Amino acid sequence: DYSANNKWMNELHLNMNADINDKTKFYGRLSMAKNWSQMGWSGTPYDLDAGRNTRSSGPVLYVDRAYLDYYITPEWIATVGRQPGTDGPGSNLRNNALRQSTYPALAINALGDAAVITYKPESLQDHKVAIRAAYGKTYQWDEEGKVRDWMSDQKDADANLYYAAVEGELPIEGMGDNLIIFNVAHMTDFALPLPGINLPIGPSGALVNVLQDGVYNLGNLTLANIHFENYNAFGTNFNYFVSLGYSNGTNAHTLSAIPAVQSQLEFNEKDGYAVHVGGRYDFTKTLKVGYEFFWGSRYWYTMSRPSINDPLNIRMTRGTAHDFYVIYQLDRYQFLRLSYTNIQNIWGNRGLPFGGAKKDKARADNIMLMYNVKF
């Protein structure tokens, strides 16, 4: 057991947008998240860009999102670039914000680059229907960080991400603003950087390298999600969301001939399930109180990473999580949020898609005060 108290952090978002012409629009965001007077930053980005831990980027700006929307017709839109893949539906209530991302947070809550085609049928715009298909990369070989490495030899395949979604508004009279999303993501050749492993072999106990440093393909991953949210439900001051998740690993790769090593690195070819629900009641325009509950099964895994708003990465829980928060709106541009989060993990290796999930008992508690300014 341990505790870490009196920790202070800053996060900065520099948002950009430009109407290039009637058909082309640009959106971007540069971000930084750092501890006060942070020490220990290495000066290099993580090997896997999509897995960047934005709790703390160090005192540097990084590209959070940068993409172009091109309106082929009023109904067909092409999008290319670094996607708005963080703080999506499912995080709006707690973040006291409007929709910040295309993708539900329980399915995709990470940095990533993709090409997307969106179809918004004019006949269904009263119900805000949008149909999307996307292709992206979550790992692409680049040994030295130079463009010429696109053409170099590589050991394992690039990881490819395919995504499809249908979203719209339920036509229920009096319900209020609502959003329902059905979406599925499939990743082939899921890749992660792994450290080298040396083990004593033979009577002499000499250390032998049984796994070299590098990026390895682990297997294929499928995620499915249904998300629903409702604001000012039926004319009240109550807002809520329900998000259901499913994950499944297949085609596990053999990484080592040593059984003891392979068992620790084996991709989980198992089904995983998750439920995330939350509600917030706005007593006044100034005072808002909310609660969220999360449950993740033994082998649950999704594309989520920690953030300054969620340092414990609640969506990776293998067990149960409870979050209570109070928002005090100072004025139109700024608010305070006091929150308490409790996570009870009953299965190990949370946040990892490999290595199994043995019975565990790990508790985490976090009390945090956030001051947020938007202008």
Residue positions per predicted region:
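Secondary-structure boundary elements
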Residues: 22, 71-75, 118-129, 168-179, ...
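Residues that flank catalytic or metal-binding motifs in active/ligand-binding sites
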Residues: 10, 64, 111-113, 160-162, ...
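Surface-exposed coil loops of outer-membrane beta-barrel proteins
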Residues: 39-65, 74-169, 198-212, 303-314
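Short loop/turn segments at secondary-structure transitions that flank enzyme active sites
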Residues: 34, 74, 84-86, 123, ...
